[in-house]
């Protein structure tokens, strides 16, 4: 230990300290209140990164007393851990970090410490405050981007009547700039969350959903696990149980469409020629014939079922399989203005094993949630061309004053704390519905993979510290929960600021969020109404202010700044649609 005392490098291992019970008062950006804890003298200078170290009572019966939370010089402080604290932490378990695999989906590769000089990571300015864990560069071939966007033959005719073309495909020259900007935006250091306010936000939404689960016990009957076959094929004729998209990629490192790894269907054998229709006939007892999807991976090309079993076994032990999300450039028509700025959107595709495992555990739950949009505050599954739209309007105008908004780069810059909180809500619903513990463990690990993702960018592998991949199978559902938690965070943060930190929702100083706000989300879009008689602090301007404090940018539906507290109901815009009552 003595040899380390004068070094600047972080200490590893353990060291003895003496301590006494005290009230620890911290002055921090989070505004943490004084709490019961311990103070002690360190045999070395405290350093950034020491927070989280365990304080253990040594002896014949050793026990964990607390966690190091603050230090100044050789003075340290820690919070005490009790049974209640440990119980709370078990709501979502972060999986254990493991070594990077050398083979994925039958493809072997090496990871080198040296990263090519042209890679975007070398072009991050020194003054940019970014944080990421650079894993290295793999030795597999990388793809090149080319756009398939072409000019319509109608453009010339349209110009004769005054309609001028204002869109085109992305420029290839913008590829490096797009990857560079995306790398910086994802990994830029953002302000910390206040864990107390986040807990209030999560408790609020769980209270609402818990009351619903108690009042609607039949909901649990519709939440169940799916078999491997049903996760691939869905259930024909049942809303929400669609088959897996066979035209999308298998993910890294295969990077080829799923259809390339499928067996030909029974229909193909019957016709005697290949077909894109992966279906099979079912001869029923009454003599009728029905059809079902018949998506089967060819084990000779890729044994996906075995790959999935290996993933599930590892995930059940809370060990990370280190799934890799490949960053791809989106080939879409862009306005000339965006082309001039060198903009190309980047999305991250998920590996097929993650997609299947997630569908097996969550698809039935997600489908059941779509039947209760106002309970789960999500418009996923809502028919915008039918009666659902009228019911939605009635709900979101429940109170007198309305708000609406959007986020800038929502999931890519999602704080890991909110992401983990959203997964804890989903896990709560799964657990309450009777999903076995082994599969809840798998869900924990999948949540860890998504909340703390590993990205592949043009050969570079790195782990992000505050981002959610845009191509994972729970994207729209999880984004909606992220949205709902963010709104609650802004709500409680506004009161926490106004009440000069004396506010505690358990004392009933103000109503719970869902009692005074009627919120509806779809991904990063939201629209709501507020009971201003009971809730004067929560509005568009306060939302933007409070979320800005944690690095989120809350904008108007048109992506501009909010200039007023509320929006008239007649001017509400949601999912690029307005609400106009039928004249009849």
Residue ranges and their predicted role:
Residues 1-18:
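Short glycine/Trp-rich loop-beta-loop segment that forms part of the substrate-binding cleft
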Residues 24-29, 52, 70-72:
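Terminal interaction modules at protein C-ends
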Residues 34-41:
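Short Pro/Gly-enriched beta-strand edge/turn motifs at strand-loop
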Residues 43-69:
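Catalytic nucleophile loop of clan PA
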């Amino acid at each position: 230990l003595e040899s380390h005392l004068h070094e600047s490098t972080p200490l590893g291992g353990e060291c003895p300290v003496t301590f006494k019970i005290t009230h620890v008062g911290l002055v921090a950006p989070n505004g943490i209140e004084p709490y019961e804890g311990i103070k002690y003298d360190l045999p070395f200078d405290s350093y950034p990164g020491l927070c989280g170290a365990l304080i253990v009572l040594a002896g014949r019966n050793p026990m964990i007393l607390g966690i190091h939370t603050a230090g100044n010089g050789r003075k340290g402080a820690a919070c005490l851990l009790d049974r209640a604290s440990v119980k709370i932490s078990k709501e979502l378990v972060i999986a254990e970090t493991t070594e990077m695999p050398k083979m994925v989906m039958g493809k072997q590769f090496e990871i080198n410490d040296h990263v090519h000089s042209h890679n975007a990571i070398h072009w991050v300015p020194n003054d940019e405050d970014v944080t990421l864990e650079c894993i290295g560069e793999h030795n597999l071939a990388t793809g090149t981007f080319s756009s398939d966007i072409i000019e319509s033959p109608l453009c010339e005719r349209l110009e004769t009547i005054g309609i001028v073309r204002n869109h085109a495909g992305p420029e290839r020259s913008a590829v490096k700039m797009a990857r560079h900007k995306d790398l910086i935006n994802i990994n830029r250091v953002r302000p910390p969350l206040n864990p107390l306010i986040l807990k209030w936000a999560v408790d609020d939404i769980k209270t609402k959903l818990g009351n619903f689960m108690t009042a609607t016990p039949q909901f649990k009957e519709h939440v169940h696990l799916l078999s491997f076959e049903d996760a691939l094929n869905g259930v024909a004729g049942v809303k929400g149980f669609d088959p897996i998209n066979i035209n999308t990629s298998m993910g890294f490192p295969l990077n080829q469409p799923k259809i390339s790894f499928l067996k030909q269907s029974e229909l193909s054998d019957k016709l005697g020629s290949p077909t894109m229709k992966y279906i099979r006939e079912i001869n029923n007892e009454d003599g009728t014939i029905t059809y079902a999807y018949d998506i089967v991976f060819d084990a000779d090309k890729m044994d996906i079922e075995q790959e999935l079993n290996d993933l599930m076994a590892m995930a059940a032990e809370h060990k990370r399989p280190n799934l890799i999300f490949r960053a791809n450039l989106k080939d879409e028509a862009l306005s000339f203005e965006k082309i001039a700025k060198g903009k190309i959107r980047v999305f991250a595709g998920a590996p097929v094993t993650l997609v299947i495992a997630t569908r097996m555990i969550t698809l039935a739950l997600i489908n059941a949630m779509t039947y209760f949009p106002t309970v789960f505050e999500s418009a996923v599954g809502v028919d915008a061309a039918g009666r659902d739209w009228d019911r939605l309007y009635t709900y979101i105008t429940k109170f007198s004053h309305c708000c609406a908004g959007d986020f800038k780069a929502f999931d890519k810059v999602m704080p890991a704390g909110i992401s983990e909180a959203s997964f804890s809500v989903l896990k709560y619903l799964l657990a309450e519905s009777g999903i076995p513990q082994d599969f809840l463990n798998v869900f924990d690990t999948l949540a860890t993979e998504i909340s703390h993702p590993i990205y592949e960018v043009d050969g570079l592998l790195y782990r992000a510290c505050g981002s959610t991949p845009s191509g994972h199978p729970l994207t729209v559902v999880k984004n909606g929960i992220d949205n709902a938690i963010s709104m609650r965070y802004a709500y409680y943060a506004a009161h926490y600021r106004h009440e000069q930190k004396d506010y505690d929702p358990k004392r009933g100083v103000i109503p719970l969020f869902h009692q005074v706000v009627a919120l509806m989300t779809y991904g990063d879009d939201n629209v709501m109404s507020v009971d201003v008689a009971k809730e004067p602090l929560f509005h568009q301007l306060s939302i933007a202010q409070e979320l800005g404090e944690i690095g989120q940018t809350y904008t108007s539906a048109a992506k501009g700044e909010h200039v007023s507290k509320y929006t008239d109901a007649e001017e509400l815009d949601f999912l690029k649609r307005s609400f106009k009552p039928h004249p009849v």
